[in-house]
């Protein structure tokens, strides 16, 4: 039984002893005074029911839920939530106001029922009406239609809050000080759980597909993942020596890899000094034996291994570079480890106020797009960062320069972590470098399933028996066959 109902019953029992002792005369049934007392009793029961329903209905509406309805609900829901929001913001004052007037109605009910009914009848009626009319029915209605009921009665709530202000406001402030305010926002883990619950795979009626839930979860996890988790290890990266020749063999390897950018190293593959844009080789003739150093080599930015992927993505999307060398910083540093470093030939590096990176990936393109950016004689371990550019960095340029290159990270690597799936194109040799799953394996499975498919769904061969026959493939290899899936070198992830 509700505590207030127990108080009502106790008062009615106390009224029995008092009436028996005083032998007071009951008010005649049907008289004006009886009708007045009966009307007041009915009003108190209904008023108590409204207060009880509003307490449950309004207090169950969270601030986040109301903001969501204001932004994405129907026009009716937007109007209702906008009307309720200012009242629900004062949660403790609203709670004290509703409970105060609910208690007043419950306390006043026995006083009037005792004057118009027999004591035993008054107890039965009081408990019954208070339980069903004052508690069960209002709360059941407001649980389902709390938004609509609250919006229609918000004017009454405002009046009651003004009337009870001298009492409710001090108590509400005390509750705010003691209990504090509830945090209406969700944490990252809670958002991921909420998204997964709304997915179709959860079987709870959600509309989000598996791809949608996967991408949203990947976006939430991206801030916690670092460059080392997404990079391609330097041992598995295809790169070129700066002193090597761009002969036919080298050009065939570059073409077979199918990458748009190739890291360039000096002496040691871990000593990455820049990157080569493959499109700059269009004018290079293999028979001339041009050195890699004679082609436009662009500087490659360096990032610490523990740099968050969101910081890398923010710099990649500026368009200056889509590849960076991941460096394992030797020195220990304080603060957030998100520093991006690049080798600069004389220019002053400028740091953006909105970025924790040391400098933009490329500050300036000298001349045309094929101009040489890196000076080979100054590329080994030197740094040209101004004092202004060093301010506010977690890692100094010297620490990054002295660090060992452990891998290469590209924009595609970041997207794969975002999508949580491997991106495979027609030139990739491996689906997953770490698991070493070859693309050819997947292609063989696809061809096998295609061969078992009905003739109407096959991509090769005539649709009908009367059509032209498909010519047999020649057993003699073509000159370009060695470029298609014959590379057995280490896997690579630098696109």
UniProtKB/Swiss-Prot annotation:
Residue segments, region Disordered: 330-354, 455-495
SUPFAM superfamilies, per the entry: CBS-domain pair
PROSITE patterns on file: CBS, CNNM
Record-annotated membrane-spanning stretches: 43-63, 93-113, 121-141, 147-167
InterPro entries: ACDP, CBS_dom, CBS_dom_sf, CNNM, Ion_transp-like_CBS
This protein's UniProt keywords: CBS domain, Glycoprotein, Membrane, Phosphoprotein, Repeat, Transmembrane, Transmembrane helix
Biased composition (Low complexity): 456-477
Topological domains annotated Cytoplasmic: 64-92, 142-146
Residue numbers of Phosphoserine PTMs: 352
Subcellular location as annotated: Membrane
Annotated membrane topology: Multi-pass membrane protein
Chain ranges on the Extracellular side, renumbered to this chain: 1-42, 114-120, 168-495
GN (gene name): CBSDUF2
Glycan-bearing residues: 349, 353
Domain (CBS): residue spans on this chain: 231-291, 296-356, 357-426
Record-level GO cellular component terms: cytosol; membrane; mitochondrion
Domain CNNM transmembrane: 30-212
Signal sequence segment: none
Protein name: DUF21 domain-containing protein At4g14230
Pfam annotation, one family: CNNM
Gene Ontology biological process terms in this record: magnesium ion homeostasis
